[in-house]
Amino acid sequence: MEVISIFGPKHGSLISLHSSYNLFKVSKVTRFRRTLFPSNHAKVFRFKALTCDNQESNNMFKELPTSEWTHHFHSIQVDVSEMDAIRIEIDALKPKVKNILMSFQGIDSTKKRILMIYMLISLGLACQFEEEIYETLKEGFGKIEEMMANEEDLYTVSIIFWVFRRYGHYISSDFFRRFKGNDGNFKKSLIGDAKGMLSFYEAANMATTKDYILDEALSFTSSHLESLAANGACPPHMSRRIRNALNASQHWNMEMLVAVEYISFYEKEKDHNEMLLKFSKLNFKFLQLQYLQELKVLTKWYKEVDFVSKLPPYFRDRIVENHFFIQTLFVESQHSRARIMMAKYFILLVIQDDTLDRYASLPEAESLVNSLNRWAPDHAMDKQPDYLKFVFKFILDTFEEFEKELRPEGGSFGVCATIEEFKSLVKANLEAEKWALADNMPSFEEYIEVTGVGITAMTTLMGAMMCMGKIVPKEDYKWLKSRPKIIQALAIKGRLMNDMKGYKEDMSRGYAANAVTCYMKQYRVTEQEALKEFEKMVAVANKTVNEEFLTTMGVSRLVLKLAMGVGLMISITYSEDEGYTHPEGKIKEKMTTLFVDQIPL
């Protein structure tokens, strides 16, 4: 199999990439700080660097443990012949599964087809049948009223609702009113239906700001599912699936992690289809091997760039973790190049963030930002330390490599647009540092406006669009420039979840202004009261993201799907602590599942 081995570490002459499109104005100060957490293995370093004023500046930081993954995947061997053999088996099974999916006819058969689509999604096979799924849902949505008439099965109604919303069809939540009794509450007869209650819970996680009945459903299903899983009323494999869903709903979980769990669950179902089961295992195994190939390419590139010898140890060593988090954006086999590019793009984001936030003196930071704004070194850069010159050169060279890769297919526009957004990012980060040093405590609303409006959410989505190449039209970049509502909701979600996990460490580093402290001071509430309110705000942001995904017009579904992926990335990152800075624990478990653990074929 061929792996995209692009963008070698060629740090030669710099070129200037000028955009003929002035799409991105410099926004107000925006900040999506990656907070630092105490670590048992952290070491405190103090370095002295010569500033452009010929004054020494003390740089203190905590050295985080290096990633345990980089060396592992750099030395791993992938059996290409095994991939070829698996591909042959997949190609043989795919038409057989397609025949099953497309053989259903009529209204009831459309229901069965949608139920099978849900199974394909859960098994990680939906990407194999995108065209068939699209046609099925397009046809079925036109018959939705007829299809749902007289349907009293909670599982069926919930799955149909979930699948349509998954693919951007705004199906009404009023269909669930049939499951309420005369007292206005959900019928008690539903409680013992574990399969139906779980699907209803999953549907409730697709709620928009106007789906009030789904708010009731989420509370109703969550409490009863916990009891079902705990009291032994369900088979062990169903109890485990319920617990996994309560920890992370399918809507807010990574597709291939869901697939691993569902394959294990499905195998224990008495009525499982052996061919589907085998197909799903082969598909996961093939993708896993492809991911390992990509990681080998990335770790080779990372070692050749040689950050360790060229930078003080202030930066987060996370190239493999980058690839993991990118699974929220690109999971399909055909997006190998996009994953590799995006992992490198994340290195750019992290290096600039750690340099400005954790290490550089203010004069150094100003010189770096000024040079990046001009896309050429300023006079002060000549006097800066070697580490800063390396950071500047690395950023320009990497964007140059992106441009060289995408230019032949007409993707230069996306690179230029992303460069402009990157400039806005570093400017905003610099201004935020100045603001923090001024020891100013803003209002909560000002803090959210200044630090939340679209910086990492915006820059991440822009980079993902760039990595997709020419298939993303120019109009979508113009749409993103307008800071649409979905981006604002993602930014608020990320800002609040970030500060909820890291505000104590922010304060220990001298940053008094964060969402928690601003809210506590302004509204005179306790820490726990503030955190409880933030949880409510994050829930509203999630509903807004869901709503905008279903209702936004004038932009491709591809970009809206990428925006949903950014929201998922935020959820995964901050599900427990700050998973990017400290990927130990749950993130490590998930990475092991995706990259290391084997599914027996």
From Swiss-Prot:
Residues involved in Mg(2+) 3 binding: 498, 506
Highest taxon of the lineage: Eukaryota
Annotated organism of origin: Arabidopsis thaliana (Mouse-ear cress)
Coiled coil: none
A biological process term (GO) from this entry: diterpenoid biosynthetic process
UniProt keywords, alphabetically: Cytoplasm, Lyase, Magnesium, Manganese, Metal-binding
Location within or outside the cell: Cytoplasm
UniProt motif (DDXXD motif) ranges: 353-357
Protein's name in the database: Terpenoid synthase 15
